[in-house]
Amino acid sequence: MFKATARYIRVQPRKARLAAGLMRNRSVVEAQQQLSFSQMKAGRCLKKVLDSAVANAESNENVKRENLCVVEVRVDAGPMFKRVKSKSRGGRAPVLKRTSHLTVIVGERGQ
């Protein structure tokens, strides 16, 4: 199994989990195709992490890309940046800028 992570990505975890659903239980080639046609920002980030995991597999163990499948995709919430938005009559409202930690694990098919 080969793992790649991206931490502190500026995308909401809830939206990233939607994009992660596109690649669960698929071969690496299918997952890359799904993510390349996705218009979500999280899809682009997950595709980079998936490419990194595949590169780890190819360089460390000489595993072919066609034999790999997505074993696990995890999207965890990272820290939040707290900002303030001005409101009427001198008020203000908190704004939470959410971040995500993305983890993709790929393995050989049949293991």
UniProtKB/Swiss-Prot annotation:
User: GO molecular function terms here?
Assistant: rRNA binding; structural constituent of ribosome
Signal peptide bounds: none
InterPro entries, alphabetized: Ribosomal_uL22, Ribosomal_uL22_bac/chlpt-type, Ribosomal_uL22_bac/org-type, Ribosomal_uL22_sf
Keywords in alphabetical order, please: Ribonucleoprotein, Ribosomal protein, RNA-binding, rRNA-binding
Task: Give the UniProt record's GO annotations in the biological process aspect.
Answer: translation
The UniProt entry's GO CC annotations, sorted and at most eight, read: cytosolic large ribosomal subunit
Instruction: Output the superkingdom of the source species.
Output: Bacteria
Q: Which Pfam family, just one, is annotated for this protein?
A: Ribosomal_L22
Membrane-spanning segments: none
HAMAP family referenced in this protein's UniProt entry, alphabetically: Ribosomal_uL22_B
Q: How does it assemble?
A: Part of the 50S ribosomal subunit.
Q: Which family does it belong to?
A: Belongs to the universal ribosomal protein uL22 family.
Q: What does this protein do?
A: This protein binds specifically to 23S rRNA; its binding is stimulated by other ribosomal proteins, e.g. L4, L17, and L20. It is important during the early stages of 50S assembly. It makes multiple contacts with different domains of the 23S rRNA in the assembled 50S subunit and ribosome.
Q: Under which name does UniProt file this protein?
A: Large ribosomal subunit protein uL22
* Species name: Chlamydia muridarum (strain MoPn / Nigg)
